Structure formats: C-alpha cells, structure tokens
C-alpha cells in the first residue's frame, strides 16, 4: 500500500504548470469512439483514470498510444467489441460515458455498472433516461447496462430533471449522430462540457450553446478525425492556489484559464489573497499572512465548485475566524473533516453543513484518504502542520492529480511516496 510522508511547516512558493483537465479528457476520450478517422489529443494528463479509460477503449478495439511528446493518438475505425467489462469499469464511474458513443455509432453497447452502484441512488439514471428519450432501448441485466437501437437515434427536446454534468455529456455525445435536432434544456454549463463540444465540432458535429443551459445538436451522418488540446484543469489550479494561501506563500499557476475560476478566485480574495490574472496565468500572494475565514456554498457552475469544497474546508480550519460550508451537490462529502479534526482542526457537521473554527496550526498525524478531493486536502494539511503526517490510500490522489508530489516539491513541500510492507 503506497502512502505519502509529509513533513510540515512549509511555505509554498514558486511556479507550477497546470495539467489538462481530467474531467474534460475522460468524456473526450470516450467521444473519440464516434470518429471514423484518427484523433490526436494533447495536454492529456497522466493519471490512473486516463489509463483505465485507454484500456477500456483498447478492449473495444480502439488503437491507442502516447507519443514521445505525451500526445494521445486514437483510431476507432475498426471497433469490433461493444462491451466495457466489469474488471475495468469497477474502478471508475465515468466509464458510463462509453455507452452513448457506442449506441450512437454502432447501435449497441454494454457497460458494467461499477460495484455497489445502484441506478436509483446514483445519477446514472439520468444518463439512461436521456438515451431512452433519443430512442435507445436499455435493460439492466447481470450487472450490465445494455443499450441498443433499431435503426437510428432520433433527436428530441430533453429537459434534464436535475443539473448533471455526466448526463449532459452523455446526451450531447449521443445526439451528434442522431437523426434531426436535439435540444438539451437545464444543461450543465461546466467548461469541460464546452471543451467536449469544441472537440466534437472539430470532428464535424454541429453543436451550439455549450456553456449555457440550452444546448442544441443537429445530427450529422459521420464524424471524422481532428487534433485537439484538452482545456487546463481548473480544480488543480484552485488546489495549488489554496496550497499557497494556507501556507502564506506566493504562487504562479501557468497554463491555466482564470475565467473558469471566478467563484474560487473571489473567495480567495475574500480570504485576503492578492491575485493577478493574465490570459493563461494566475498569481496569488498571501504575503506571509494567515487567511481569513470565508463562507462557502457549493453550486453548479458557474457557482462555487464542489470539487474545491474540501480544500476550502482546510483553509477555513487554519483561517482567522469561523465559517459555514454548505455542500449542495453531493452527499457524504465531509469525510475529510474527521481526519482534519484528528490533526487539531475544529469543526461540527450538521447535515449538509459544516461549521469551521480556525486554529493557528495543525499537528501532523496518520490520516486516511477517502476520495480524490478529500485526500488532497489531507496532503496540503500535512504541508503546513507541525511534525510528520502520513496519508494512507493515496491511490485516490493518483486518479486526479498528475505528478502531485513532484509539483509540490517544486514549491518547497517536503513530501515523499513510500510503500508500506504488509506483514503477515
């Protein structure tokens, strides 16, 4: 089992290059199933979820490889298999995105449900209902979602009941080859959806309105190849900005896009950070000061992102003053708080709200990561705590942060990865 050992009391300063967004790369990789010609993608991060996606695509018959510059090449012209198997899907819920392009182009597709994933309790039902509205017949058998269509998907007006990034992407991807016009209402507006639409349009799709709550897709007969660069990762950017803010440091995030982070930047300014932005950089300077507490309420984009909630929970635990954090997007997303309390943080949880009371310092401890964003907050806590922090289950971090310890060390953090030997 791999773990991180972090030695604390580091002030994080310097420059960091932001990677491509995993949340754009994943749907774009699956959307490449639609292409009848080769596709080249640049700025694709090296992450476990990306590797899993490439393995799923290879299982379907897509030829994939990374060149010496790190670009990912895909050729889906000879897909001969239509099942995304459990042994790959079980580690990544985003695998459901394989279903839409398969049924759209090949009239059939099967994707295993991830372990423990009940359709009624997960947003997977929104993916399925969207495809059904386009004419797909879907059954759940033997742990697989099986979809097929007689003839062709047919464009429809689809109102998504609850704003969902995943469902918006599934419907948009499927509708590119549907007959007629599809209109998605109450669509999610995230930049990763816009990036996926840009990619699809480069291949010959006719999509308008991505980035707004109404997306229109005019179906086309086929999609060709293209080259595309993945949009920068706004959540990684926000994470490094918080890292500097909680440590009193100064950071320049390069290869990023400030316009996708307005809500986060506003809150960091409220916390006392001096921030300057250019077209592709963000500079944050805390000038050695402790942050001020800020209230947070997560909302769909362009509101405050749920994927930054854990990082700001940490910020509030070491800030001056008290704060209220309300999580409106996901349930059970405060699992990092008990671990931060073990490090000396002060907070109470009432339903979907956490009340944080800032302390001057945290103390190193052995803590356990529970999910991607919670785990990075524990690593950052270790960077500023007194003493040594051990973070367990860091495979969560490897799913979403490229070369994280290398980047943190470049900013002055004392962090190392090690493998703990299991004794019988």
Swiss-Prot record:
EC numbers listed for it are 2.5.1.7
Which Gene3D superfamilies does the entry link to?
Enolpyruvate transferase domain
> Span of the secretion signal?
none
Catalysed transformations (reactions):
phosphoenolpyruvate + UDP-N-acetyl-alpha-D-glucosamine = UDP-N-acetyl-3-O-(1-carboxyvinyl)-alpha-D-glucosamine + phosphate
Pathway of action: Cell wall biogenesis; peptidoglycan biosynthesis
Which EC class is the enzyme in? transferase
Record key words, sorted:
Cell cycle, Cell division, Cell shape, Cell wall biogenesis/degradation, Cytoplasm, Peptidoglycan synthesis, Pyruvate, Transferase
Give its localization: Cytoplasm
InterPro entries, alphabetized:
Enolpyruvate_Tfrase_dom, Enolpyruvate_Tfrase_sf, MurA_subfamily, RNA3'P_cycl/enolpyr_Trfase_a/b, UDP_GlcNAc_COvinyl_MurA
Residues involved in phosphoenolpyruvate binding: 22-23
Specify where it is mainly localized. Answer: cytoplasm
| UniProt cross-references to SUPFAM superfamilies, sorted A to Z | EPT/RTPC-like
Recorded GO MF terms = UDP-N-acetylglucosamine 1-carboxyvinyltransferase activity
- Give the record's GO biological process terms: cell division; cell wall organization; peptidoglycan biosynthetic process; regulation of cell shape; UDP-N-acetylgalactosamine biosynthetic process
PTM sites of type 2-(S-cysteinyl)pyruvic acid O-phosphothioketal: 117
| Any one cellular-component term (Gene Ontology) | cytoplasm
Q: Which family does it belong to?
A: Belongs to the EPSP synthase family. MurA subfamily.
Q: What does this protein do?
A: Cell wall formation. Adds enolpyruvyl to UDP-N-acetylglucosamine.
What is the protein named?
UDP-N-acetylglucosamine 1-carboxyvinyltransferase
Q: Which organism is it from?
A: Histophilus somni (strain 129Pt)
Q: What is the lineage of its organism?
A: Bacteria, Pseudomonadati, Pseudomonadota, Gammaproteobacteria, Pasteurellales
């Amino acid at each position: 089992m791999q773990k991180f050992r972090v030695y604390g009391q580091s002030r994080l300063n310097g420059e960091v290059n932001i990677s491509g967004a995993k949340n754009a790369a994943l749907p774009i990789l699956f959307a490449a199933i639609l292409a009848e010609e080769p596709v080249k993608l640049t700025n694709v991060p090296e992450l476990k979820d990306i590797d899993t996606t490439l393995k799923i695509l290879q299982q379907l018959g897509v030829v994939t490889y990374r060149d010496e510059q790190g670009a990912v090449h895909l050729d889906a012209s000879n897909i001969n298999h239509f099942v995304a198997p459990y042994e790959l899907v079980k580690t990544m819920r985003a695998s459901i995105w394989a279903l839409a392009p398969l049924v759209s182009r090949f009239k059939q597709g099967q994707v295993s449900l991830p372990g423990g994933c009940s359709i009624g309790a997960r947003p997977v039902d929104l993916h399925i209902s969207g495809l059904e509205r386009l004419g797909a017949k879907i059954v759940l058998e033997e742990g697989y979602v099986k979809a097929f269509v007689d003839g062709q998907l047919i464009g429809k007006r689809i109102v998504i009941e609850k704003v969902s990034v995943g469902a918006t992407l599934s419907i948009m991807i499927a509708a590119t080859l549907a007959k007629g016009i599809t209109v998605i209402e109450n669509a999610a507006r995230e930049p990763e959806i816009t990036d996926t639409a840009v990619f699809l349009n480069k291949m010959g799709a006719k999509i308008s309105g991505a980035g707004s709550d109404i997306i229109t897709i005019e179906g086309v007969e086929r999609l060709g190849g293209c080259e595309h660069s993945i949009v920068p990762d706004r959540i990684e950017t926000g994470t490094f900005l918080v890292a500097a803010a909680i440590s009193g440091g100064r950071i320049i995030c390069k290869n990023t896009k400030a316009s996708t982070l307005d809500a986060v930047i506003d809150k960091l300014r409220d916390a006392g950070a001096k921030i300057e932005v250019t077209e592709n950089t963000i500079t944050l300077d805390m000038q050695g000061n402790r942050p001020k507490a800020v209230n947070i309420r997560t909302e769909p984009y362009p509101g405050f992102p749920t994927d930054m909630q854990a990082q700001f929970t940490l910020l509030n635990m070491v800030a001056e003053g008290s704060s209220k954090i309300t999580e409106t997007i996901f349930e059970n997303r405060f699992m990092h708080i008990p671990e931060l309390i073990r490090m000396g943080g002060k907070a109470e949880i009432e339903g979907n709200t956490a009340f944080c009371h800032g302390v001057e310092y945290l103390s190193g401890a052995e803590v356990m990561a529970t999910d991607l964003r919670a785990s990075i907050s524990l690593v950052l806590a270790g960077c500023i705590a007194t003493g040594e922090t051990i973070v367990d289950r860091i495979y969560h971090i490897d799913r979403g942060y490229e070369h994280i310890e290398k980047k943190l060390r470049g900013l002055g953090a004392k962090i190392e990865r090690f493998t703990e030997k299991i004794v019988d």
